[in-house]
Amino acid sequence: MLHRGRSCLTGLFPCYLLSNWLNSNLCWIPLKLVIPCFQLIVESYLLEFLLLLAISTCLLGEDSLIWLTLVVAHSKSRQSSSQEPLDTRMATRALLDQLRSDRRHN
């Protein structure tokens, strides 16, 4: 997969560093919330993601990852081609639907 001339592999090392940072500095965060966010790192804006993650997790706790996903998806949809925003919105909607159904069952 290529995105704007960059291989998706460029996102793997930052993902590794981020996962180590999360494990050592923050309380446990559900993996099902982190993986979609990692996908956003690989596809788009690493620095924006890290900044929002640090601020939102410290201030709002683990539920802020939902907010973070929406903010990054919105930012990506504003700066992408005409097809990508639809895909991003659909992926974000699917993630939120899954989280809602999981909370209902718990």
UniProtKB/Swiss-Prot annotation:
Its main location: mitochondrion. Keywords: Mitochondrion. It is found in: Mitochondrion. It comes from the Eukaryota. GO terms for cellular component: mitochondrion. A stretch of 270 kb of the mitochondrial genome is duplicated within the centromere of chromosome 2 resulting in the duplication of the gene. The expression of this duplicated gene (At2g07701) is not demonstrated. This is Uncharacterized mitochondrial protein AtMg00430/AtMg01150. The lineage of its organism: Eukaryota, Viridiplantae, Streptophyta, Embryophyta, Tracheophyta.
